Amino acid sequence: MTGIVFGEQPRWHEDRLWFSDWGPPEVIAVDLEGKSEVILEAPSFPCCVDWLPDGRLLLVSAREGLLLRREPDGSLVTHGDLTGVSDPPPGNELVVDGRGNAYVNGPGFDMMAGAEFAPGGIALVTPEGSARQVADGIAFPNGMLVTPDNATLIVADSYGKCLTAFDIASDGSLANRRVWADLGDGVPDGICLDAENAVWYGDVPNERCVRVREGGDVLQTVELDRGCFACALGGPDRSTLFMMATEWSGPEKML
């Protein structure tokens, strides 16, 4: 698919690839035949989506600092308020576990405004809608995933050039922080998990998508002609790799 302004955060859901185009901004779904549909127009960018266990879509509207929920009638309602969690509120990436816990991360500074660097963190929004910070001190938190057993959360630290893992407690808290993979010169952005528990990560400055196992061993590399911001596995057997690739000109081009 071409003509995407700035594609981010792909997810395979109900036999289609869903992703956010931060340009308009909007959420789009496309099937394997290339037929696409604009699902909704987002209030602002960055915007990212995932689904609750009951199938309702969650959407982060970063500018407002809100986690929104799409109801069956198509309306968007507030699921959680992130404005009190950190400044700026998190809004870069979203992942939901099988219990309905939503994790939202973000850097500790406003990159789009050229603010001075500060490390970021991860917020938890419970199924009841309460929000709190559950991890901090991550240089630049980016892509996230939760393992199928709901036991581990893995986050890409772009500035730290590593994948960091946490154990997920029964109340959604994160503990036992550890480096899951040191990526050397790799700069991870969006990530996804495959059937062998290896992780694919998009790499913007190195223009590639890389598959690594725990510990950092590189298993496979797909070279591209532009920055790879995110990736997802989908298709009938969840083995087709989809990559969101964009010619990156800096954050000022997104304003």
Describe the residue ranges of each PLM region:
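Blade-level signature of beta-propeller repeat domains, shared across WD40, Kelch, NHL, RCC1
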Residues: A230-L255
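Structural recognition of the beta-propeller blade-terminating site
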Residues: V30-D31, R70-P72, T126, D167, ...
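A short loop-to-beta-strand structural motif that recurs across blades of beta-propeller domains
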Residues: E26-I28, L66-L68, A113, G120-A123, ...
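Short loop/turn segments immediately following beta-strands, especially the blade-tip
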Residues: F166-S173
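A short beta-strand motif characteristic of beta-propeller blades
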Residues: M1, G34-E41, L76-G84, S130-D136, ...
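Short, solvent-exposed loop/turn segments at conserved positions within beta-propeller repeat blades
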Residues: W22-G23, A62-R63, F109-G120, S158-K161, ...
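Beta-propeller domains
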Residues: D15-L40
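Beta-rich, blade/repeat-based domains predominating
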Residues: M1-R16, A42-S61, L66, G84-F109, ...
